[in-house]
UniProtKB/Swiss-Prot annotation:
Family the entry assigns: Belongs to the formate--tetrahydrofolate ligase family.
EC code: 6.3.4.3
Domain of life: Bacteria
InterPro entries reported in the protein's UniProt record: Formate_THF_ligase, P-loop_NTPase
CDD domains xref list: FTHFS
Chemical reaction(s) catalysed: (6S)-5,6,7,8-tetrahydrofolate + formate + ATP = (6R)-10-formyltetrahydrofolate + ADP + phosphate
Binding site for ATP: T65, P66, F67, G68, E69, G70, K71, T72
Protein name according to UniProt: Formate--tetrahydrofolate ligase
Gene that this polypeptide is encoded by: fhs
GO MF annotation list: ATP binding; formate-tetrahydrofolate ligase activity
Record's keyword terms, sorted: ATP-binding, Ligase, Nucleotide-binding, One-carbon metabolism
Amino acid sequence: MQSDIEISRQHTCLPITEIAKDLGLNPDEFSPCGVNKAKVSQSVARRLADKKNAKLVIVTAVTPTPFGEGKTVTTIGLTQAMNLNGIKTCACIRQPSMGPVFGTKGGAAGGGYAQVVPMEELNLHLTGDIHAVSSAHNLAAAAIDARLFHEHRLGAEVFAQESGLSALNIDSENILWRRVVDHNERSLRQIKVGYGKVNGPVHESGFDITAASELMAILALSQDLKDLRQRIGRLVLALNTQGEPITAEELGVAGAMTVIMADAIEPTLMQTLSGDPCFIHAGPFANIAHGNSSIIADTIAAKLADVVITEAGFGSDMGFEKFSNIKVRESGYAPSASVVVVTLKALKANSGIESDKDINQPDMERLQAGFANLEWHINNVSQYGVPVVVAINRFPTDTDEELEWLKQAVEQTKAFGSEISEAFGKGAEGATKLADMVYHATQTPSDFKLLYQSDTSLEAKLMTLAEVGYGASSVTLSDKAKSQLHWLTKHNYGQLPICVAKTPMSISHDPSIKGIPTEFELPITELRLNAGAGFVTALVGQVMTMPGLGIKPGYLNVDINDDGEIIGLA
């Protein structure tokens, strides 16, 4: 079979104007960016405000493995198959970060014959939204350091006289706002800035990947431009010498940051290999951020289609949990059905059984042992009151015997049902049965519920997430986290939801624990306020907000030929 980029390149895309017209957009509601993509205005949602929302389907997965489970393939394949079945369907996915593209994971356009095209345009830059987030974020970092420099140089009283501004009295040891870049760069995790007499007080800083920026979360959670502006104004950038928060509004930089991001608030419209519409907007990671595409994209798609299919990053303990307790809490747009993606390889890898057998070879012992992980994820999603369809993403090496055993095993669970998907190799035709089942699931009664209420304490929310969300026996807080919990409660941030940053490779905090971890303590090492996004991030165990490149990164395979064709992009 050809590579993803070869399949993408050999396909002739429809003009994006035709995709927009078929979707129901008026000419003044979108702005083409070349021939393959377009920015879409929120005015379409206002025009169709009285139209009933589409049924929303959320795609999640079992605990991820290095082999890839195929969530995006399933999301795109389902969209293609739904449309083939005569149901007007639109996909909504995140914009890929160049960190994974040039690192280990690769791009996020789907794959095979279930992908968004042109895949190189999606995976590299798109319409520049991530760069806008980076620029706005780093403007705030520059602004806080400049203010610190001038107040320190002149003293508070002289500064106020010369600038006409009130001194903020920034505590250089409590500057919370780091810098960002859209690459994996471990050497920038911890740095010191301000060296030299004319460069400001020396203080610690560091870089996160742009996908972990609070601005990326704000972009994904904002309802409109006004909401974006207000959320940016609420960003807490530092503490003053009295321990009180200093916001972007107080620093006077919130307006300029919003201006940089003004165009980024519009989702980008592209198409699948079948010519189906797909919105791409925002790109927060699911392990260190909330891991879902934007509310705005969902809102627009909901008025134009009969079914909207979106995906949440990593397993259901990660992206789906945050989709439910953060995104839906904000949007009020609850799912009518869910899809849990699984592969035979994923279950074998999650079995916890060491074996010399090739993971692609039949191994009923490991498959049966690993099934517990799938059942855990089915139960996890079911507790939110949403019908669960299991999508078995078939690989060429899978045997009929193992697939049939898995389908029968799913029948004994709380799942609505299961179907095999061959969207990767066959496109829409490979997922029509899955699409039928998912559509029927959307027509059954659902009773979506949150895992916890906003008015419960942060400590109670952490305990609920640990015990009910991950199966932990208890929660432990470091001394730093305890101090931060006290500060957050004192400053009235206790009503915010929790965004857990942890390893995605286990339901627990320890990536080496496979299957269903039990009787473990969830160690909270740090609590970070995201006042603009509207949640508190709880760092669990050893988690990094800036990834690093591996020993054989993806960029080694990427090049461009004399005709301008990109080579080796995965």
